[in-house]
From Swiss-Prot:
Main function: Binds 23S rRNA and is also seen to make contacts with the A and possibly P site tRNAs.
Organism in which the protein naturally occurs: Prochlorococcus marinus (strain MIT 9211)
Entry protein name: Large ribosomal subunit protein uL16
Family matches, as NCBIfam families: rplP_bact (TIGR01164)
UniProt keyword Membrane, yes or no: no
Pfam families: Ribosomal_L16
Entry GO CC: ribonucleoprotein complex; ribosome
One Gene Ontology MF term: rRNA binding
InterPro entries recorded: Ribosomal_uL16 (IPR047873), Ribosomal_uL16_bact-type (IPR000114), Ribosomal_uL16_CS (IPR020798), Ribosomal_uL16_dom (IPR016180), Ribosomal_uL16_sf (IPR036920)
Biased composition (Acidic residues): 156-168
DNA-binding in keyword set: no
Length: 179
């Protein structure tokens, strides 16, 4: 199951889940995805159960990307203990999910929309929140997270060169003010 290798602090406060996901809300790797419709916590066990359900249905056909990671520790006190005497020990890990967050992605040459939809439906049953199936439109490509395409890098270089040319041509003379 998923859990961080090491963390700065062992315990966290529970926190609140307000608003919608502004990051991780677009398809980045595959053609099909499962998107959260409401907020909640998803445990590492639920993520693993969903992953197994999808891979069992897809078999060897395509590729599955897990877009969430359980990085929040949830503490629990032992049963039948009295109040007080500090916070309990970390028992399991959860991923904090906001509406709009992409949970899983699926893609590959052998994956059709019907196969992906059924695999995601099986994964939905393992999750404690409402989700929906989304697919890329025809001709649309996934936005690669953290990877800039060579075309976009070329456009950035051209923009930077044109800005430096404009700056050198417009800064013909410099006036100094003496006091």
């Amino acid at each position: 199951m998923l859990s961080p290798k090491r963390t700065k602090f062992r315990k966290q406060q529970r926190g609140r889940m307000r608003g919608v996901a502004t990051r991780g809300n677009k398809i980045a790797f595959g053609q099909f995805a499962l998107q959260a419709q409401e907020c909640g916590w998803i445990t590492s066990r639920q993520i693993e159960a969903s992953r197994r359900a999808m891979t069992r249905y897809v078999k060897r056909g395509g590729q599955i990307w897990i877009r969430i990671f359980p990085d929040k520790p949830v503490t629990m006190r032992p049963a039948e203990t009295r109040m007080g005497s500090g916070k309990g020990n970390p028992e399991f890990w959860v991923a904090v999910i906001k509406p709009g967050r992409i949970l899983f992605e699926m893609g590959g040459e052998e994956i059709t929309e019907s196969i992906a939809r059924e695999a995601m439906r099986l994964a939905q049953y393992k999750l404690p929140i409402k989700t929906k199936f989304i697919a890329l439109a025809e001709g649309e490509t996934p936005t690669q997270v953290g990877k800039a395409s060579s075309a976009s890098l070329a456009n950035l270089d051209e923009d930077a060169n044109s800005q430096t040319d404009d700056e050198t041509s417009s800064s013909g003379s410099v006036a100094t003010v003496e006091s």
